[in-house]
């Protein structure tokens, strides 16, 4: 495991133990989608129930649109779910732990703008 991977694992483990982890509905859906085996689906669903669900409001969607436009003006197209995750993180002043390359590019632009940790 690389140093970066170890750091992310430690950060995530600490955040879970401290109950600082939240997810939004679209992440829950994305993680569960495509699991064909009913038993595996139910096990993962139960595991995800341990995480607080951060409710989405009109503000989050409007903020996502604003951030999308900002990223686009910097030459980057962000996916709808990726930029929604960023909007929630900006509003909560929260960090995002991810290995998703598309989301990481969005985060880089928003960090450069001083909007994300």
Features from the language model and the residues they span:
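Acidic catalytic patch
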Residues: 50-73
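Short loop->beta-strand "edge-of-pocket" segments that line small-molecule binding or catalytic clefts
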Residues: 20-23, 49-55, 95
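Short, well-structured N-terminal submotif of metal-dependent ribonuclease cores
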Residues: 1-23, 33-46, 117
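Histidine- and aromatic-rich ligand-binding microenvironments
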Residues: 24, 77-79, 100, 116-117
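Short beta-strand scaffold positions
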Residues: 55-58, 80, 98
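Acidic, PIN/NYN-like endoribonuclease modules and their adjacent C-terminal/linker elements
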Residues: 11-13, 86, 90-117
């Amino acid at each position: 495991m690389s140093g970066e991977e170890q750091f992310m694992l430690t950060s995530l483990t600490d955040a879970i133990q401290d109950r600082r982890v939240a997810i939004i509905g679209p992440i829950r859906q994305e993680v569960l989608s495509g699991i064909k085996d009913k038993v595996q689906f139910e096990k993962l669903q139960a595991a995800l129930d341990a995480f607080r669900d951060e409710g989405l409001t009109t503000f989050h969607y409007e903020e996502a649109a604003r951030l999308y436009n900002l990223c686009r003006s910097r030459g980057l197209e962000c996916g709808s779910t990726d930029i929604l995750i960023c909007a929630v993180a900006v509003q909560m002043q929260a960090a995002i732990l991810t290995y998703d390359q598309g989301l990481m590019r969005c985060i880089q632009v928003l960090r450069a703008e001083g909007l994300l940790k």
